[in-house]
Every structure is written in C-alpha cells, then in structure tokens.
Amino acid sequence: MLFCNDSNKELREQKVSLSHEFATDNHRVEKLSLKFENIYFDYSKNLVNDNILKTLLESASKSNLKNKIQQMFAGEKINSTENRSVLHTALRDLSNSPLVIDGQDIRKEVNEEKQRVKALVEKVTSGDWKGFSGKRITDIVNIGIGGSDLGPKMVVRALQPYHCTGLKVHFVSNVDADSLLQALHVIDPETTLFIVASKSFSTEETLLNSISAREWLLDHYEDEKAVANHFVAISSKLDKVEEFGINLEHCYKMWDWVGGRYSLWSSIGMSIAFAVGYDNFEKLLAGAYSIDKHFKETEFDKNIPVIMGLLASYYSCAYQSQSQALLPYDERLCYFVDYLQQADMESNGKSVNLAGEGVDYQTGVVLWGGVGTNGQHAFHQLLHQGNVFIPVDFIAVATSHHNYDNHQQALLANCFAQSQALMFGQSYDMVYNELLNSGLSEVQAKQLAPHKVIPGNRPSTTILLDELSPYTLGALIALYEHKIFVQGVLWDINSYDQWGVELGKKLGKNILKAMSDDSSAEYQNLDESTKWLIAKVKSK
C-alpha cells in the first residue's frame, strides 16, 4: 500500500488529538461528514487532520482507484486468479443499458432471470403454487451456507416490519443436524417449499441437509413425484438438480461473475422476496444501485465508500489495528455483523498481492461486534480501557417502526454516548476530583482513580439512517461492499477469490473417509493428534 511506504513514515507517526481537533476547529463536523440521500456519514471522530486526509486521498489516486472502479463496473476480469468479472453490481443496475461480457448482453439475461424469480414468488404467495397434496405453501426453507445463507438471513430479519406475504421463512445452513431439525420441528411437509441454494449442487453442508429434507418429505408422502412440488433450486448444475427430482423449470441461475458473498442481489435473494414481497426486494436493489452510482461518479473526497476504505486501511497501516468493531444500534440488524464478517474477511484475508508476491504490510482485519446496547454490558469494556487499538463503526437509525419512542430515544442516546466516551474518555484529574466529591478520602481517591481512567482518543465513525427500509438497507450493504473493494485496491490484493477455504474442505473429506475405515490410506496419512481425536469419538 502506498501509504505504508517509508516516505510517509513521519506522517504516519503524527499523533492526532481528537479533543484538540474539536476544540480548535468549529467546522470539523461540517468538513468531516457527508450526506447521501437519507444516510448521514459522520467521520469527524477519526484520527485524521487535513494533512492526513490529503495524503490518504492522494494515495487513492496513486493506487489507480478510479480506473479500478471503472474496470469493475465495465465487467473486466478483475478477479484475476479465477479469470472472472465481478458484477454483483449488474444485478441491481436499473439503467438497462447493455453490458456485454464474453459476447453476451448480460443485462438482458439478468432481467429475464429477475422476471422468473418474480413469477415464482407471486405464484407461491398467491396460492397458485400448491404442495403435492393440493395445499397452499405456508413456509419457505432456504438451505444454503455462506453467501447463500448469511445475506438473505440478515435481510429477512432486518426487514421484518416489511414482511407482507404471510409466508414464514426459515434458514438452514450448518451441517449439524440440529440446524435442520429446528426447521423441521415447526413446519408441515404438505405446506413447505425448500430452496436448495448451491452453485455446484455439491456443497457438502447444503447437499446433506437437502438430502435429509428430501427424505423427511418422502417419509410423509412416500412418492418421489412430491419432490417437484416442494423443492426449487438455485444452481448452475442442471443435471444434478434434475437427478435430485427438481423440475428444471424451477432451477434458477447463478453466474460465475457473482461471488457467493455478494449474491443476495441475485436469485439467492429469492427467500427475501418470499418474506417481503418482490416489490420490496426491488427497492432493496434500488438502494444498492443508488450507492453504486455514488461510488462510481462522486469525487473521492465526497465519496462515502472511498472514505470508509481509506480510513480502515490507514488504521491497519499506521496503527497496526488487527480488528474492527461494528456496532449496529438496531435489533433488526442483529445478523449484520455475521454477514459482513464473511464479506470483509473472506474478501481481504489475503497475504499475497495480485502478482502473487508476499506482502510486508497488514491487510484484512478481524471484523466483530454486536447490537447495542447489549455490547455495552459485554465487550465495550475492552473498547474503552483495553490496550488494543480497535476502530469502531456505529450504525444507528433515527426513526423506528414501532411507537415506543422512549425506547428509541434511549437507544440513540446510548449510541451517541458510546462514541463520545471513546473520543473524550475521562482523565485522572477528572476521575480523582469526582471521587473526592463523592466523599472518598484523598488516599482512597488516589488508589481508585487509575482504575477509572478512560484514555479516550479512540476513533469511531457513525452512520445514521433516517429509517431502516428496503431501500436504505440496500444502500447500507452496498456502502460496505464498496469499502471492501477500496481496501483491496489499496492493498493490491484480489478481494474476490477465497482459496483459503478450500484446504479445510479437502481435508474434511479425507477425514470423513478415515473415520469409517482405519485401514484406509486417508487414515494412515493422518497426524497422531487427529487419529487420537477420531479414536475418542469412536469410543463413545
């Protein structure tokens, strides 16, 4: 990353005091905040000054970020290790202008697929789609993992006030049978439609759960023909889908140019549409599209995803931050951190650059967090008084869907108080005087004061939404998607492959064979620790 060059060492070592910056610049918030439609982005509590921001923006230009953005939107194959375009943005592009990739106008293909999904959703929600026994569908079970689960699950929960179809949507992901059983215990085989979401139709967890769900269905019906009434698929392997018993008319496309962690905008978002209706699903896409245009067309100093990516990369480089906390102050966003963990860590958890050379600077960080105010009674202690450097993103919503205004005001007050506490902290003198005023002796106050000091000067960003609607949620997700892209460009890494997950899958298959046959080559090749663990399992 250019900002990590030795030539910028002096600038990187420049210490910024937030208390000083706010005390000496009455216009700091005005200068270091941005508004886009109904999103307010306040980054004034970050450890930057005019000089640092200038250098960061220059770094973005020197990294050829503008051209890289254009390349992505144009469909150039920026996923170099897999020779693929990165075009999740095309799934929500409302311009309808042609986009030709490998000789085909994918815009036309995308729109056709959207209409197929819309038709299915309307057929099921209207009651025209019937189960094998003639009953209408009441429950949808999405079987998928990773991007086929985390995104849709997050959105369905976040948009719960917009559920309007009467359908109950469930999610099954883990290969642990308990994940599947939780759904099977509350659904009726005669009124359930399963979605099998797997590009290869061979993902171990998804396939095993789907086979077990199929067996459960057939235990009830005892007729193979029932599968076609109760299963649809999202896959590119038509032969495997047909072999499973799913009508190919009910198999929906997945394209190579859409990565799993960016796939909720595709047919993978079908479960979202089943919950909130297709019109609201389109509003989700429209919100993301608005940010796509903002990202592509706005100058860097006013570009929210660019600023987000620059700040995160700056902290990784200059402060060696190894994690970032994401704190949504809205219960509806309770799965947002889980979703972004995959989007961020699977994208930027890389240690070689685009040329395949090892990098000597830090790249991806651990993204973690939880909903407020729960975190205040769990891990915020570390944020305030721990000796690790952790930048924080607060996400808040100005208005809620309910009428409990006192709850909403308390929630927002806590959010803003946490960002203020991180910024200013409380000094020894402040604590000492408070203790004296509370009645403690000087000796007692001196003993206790060091334990109550909060250093402050810890950076945070606040993203404030007017409301949490399908449109604003789509925009929020897209902000973070593009932030991840910006970081990848600055670090000169490929944010769109994920080779690191393959080894564990391969070894898992070998160990599964070894567990059933200790004379197999797979067992003989195991290390002693793994053999010991297998023996312990077999002894039970």
Curated annotation (Swiss-Prot):
Superkingdom assignment: Bacteria
UniProt keywords, alphabetically: Cytoplasm, Gluconeogenesis, Glycolysis, Isomerase
Record carries keyword Cytoplasm: yes
Disulphide linkage map: none
Predominant location category: cytoplasm
One Gene Ontology cellular component annotation held by this UniProt entry: cytosol
Subcellular location(s) of the protein: Cytoplasm
EC number: 5.3.1.9
Keyword S-adenosyl-L-methionine attributed: no
SUPFAM superfamilies in UniProt: SIS domain
One Gene Ontology term from the biological process aspect of the record: gluconeogenesis
GO molecular function: carbohydrate derivative binding; glucose-6-phosphate isomerase activity; monosaccharide binding
Reactions that this protein is recorded to catalyse: alpha-D-glucose 6-phosphate = beta-D-fructose 6-phosphate
Pathway entry: Carbohydrate biosynthesis; gluconeogenesis; Carbohydrate degradation; glycolysis; D-glyceraldehyde 3-phosphate and glycerone phosphate from D-glucose: step 2/4
Active site (UniProt): 346, 377, 505
CDD domains reported in the protein's UniProt record: SIS_PGI_1, SIS_PGI_2
Purpose: Catalyzes the reversible isomerization of glucose-6-phosphate to fructose-6-phosphate.
Similarity annotation: Belongs to the GPI family.
Protein name in UniProt: Glucose-6-phosphate isomerase
Upper classification of the organism: Bacteria, Pseudomonadati, Pseudomonadota, Gammaproteobacteria, Thiotrichales
Gene, per the UniProt record: pgi
